[in-house]
Amino acid sequence: MSATDLASLEKIIEAAFDNRDNVNTSTKGEVRDAVESALDLLDAGKARVAERSSDGAWTVNQWLKKAVLLSFRLNDMDVVKGGSGNSTWWDKVPSKFENWGENHFRAAGFRAVPNCVVRRSAYIAPNAILMPSFVNLGAYVGEGTMVDTWATVGSCAQIGKHVHLSGGVGIGGVLEPMQAGPTIIEDNCFIGARSEVVEGCIIREGSVLGMGVFIGKSTKIVDRATGEVTYGEVPPYSVVVAGSMPSGNATMGNGQPAPHLYCAVIVKRVDEKTRSKTGINELLRD
């Protein structure tokens, strides 16, 4: 699709979103066609909710998020087939795999293990592996990435190439508020079991999160080497574990010292060469 065509789609969707109170299941014509085209672009990986520039900055295509939101107004509830024992679900978003056969899967080039759930408009790149997991609408999963058992990739989340999302990992989705950016895991990251990255935080390339690390916008990210405290972004090639920080001189009502509070700790930085040659368990040993 040409830049002119994309600009035309964006214009229609922006206008429809501004007038969204009048968009419903009866809406036909260019609004419905534009939303369907936008969802098809997302589903095929030809458009992304967020894109990384050469300087590392991420640009959010808000109009694509708006297209996803408009689809909820346009689509009525319907039966979704495919449950165990011929059971069904009741939803507005069909499966990405609806009506797929062998040819579709071979062309797509990724593995979809039984009981994984991928909603329409999520893109899964070739050589990715989906264990029984959940990938929400508008998300992007890069080439060679493993989404392990019970991991969740939230709406519009961006997962890079050769990422490992371990068992039970949660990557938060962001559709609203509209100005919020999606949660982003860049290329070659390892996210340890049961960790959570949410609220539009960014884990930069090559980073390793140990098991049970939780990072949201208000989470303190502490560099052990420097004492620097940052929020919302883990630098490239960082090794991060769960930790805690003292509450200063604060005391509780009973006069006892206040409890330490959770933080994420950058215990070391590694270069790309070391990261590629060193086992994850070895990196996490202190």
Swiss-Prot record:
UniProt subcellular location: Cytoplasm
One annotated Gene Ontology cellular component of this protein: cytoplasm
Keywords attached to this entry: Acyltransferase, Amino-acid biosynthesis, Cytoplasm, Diaminopimelate biosynthesis, Lysine biosynthesis, Repeat, Transferase
Gene from which the chain derives: dapD
The protein's name in its UniProt record: 2,3,4,5-tetrahydropyridine-2,6-dicarboxylate N-succinyltransferase
Pfam families the record matches: Hexapep_2 (PF14602), THDPS_N_2 (PF14805)
GO MF annotations, alphabetized: 2,3,4,5-tetrahydropyridine-2,6-dicarboxylate N-succinyltransferase activity; nucleotidyltransferase activity
PROSITE patterns: HEXAPEP_TRANSFERASES
E.C. designation(s): 2.3.1.117
Family: Belongs to the transferase hexapeptide repeat family.
Taxonomic superkingdom: Bacteria
InterPro entries according to UniProt: DapD_Trfase_Hexpep_rpt_fam, Hexapep, Hexapep_transf_CS, THP_succinylTrfase_dom1, THP_succinylTrfase_N_sf, Trimer_LpxA-like_sf
Binding site for substrate: 111, 148
Protein's GO biological process: diaminopimelate biosynthetic process; lysine biosynthetic process via diaminopimelate
Pathway given in the UniProt record: Amino-acid biosynthesis; L-lysine biosynthesis via DAP pathway; LL-2,6-diaminopimelate from (S)-tetrahydrodipicolinate (succinylase route): step 1/3
Record field: catalytic activity: (S)-2,3,4,5-tetrahydrodipicolinate + succinyl-CoA + H2O = (S)-2-succinylamino-6-oxoheptanedioate + CoA
Organism: Rhizobium johnstonii (strain DSM 114642 / LMG 32736 / 3841) (Rhizobium leguminosarum bv. viciae)
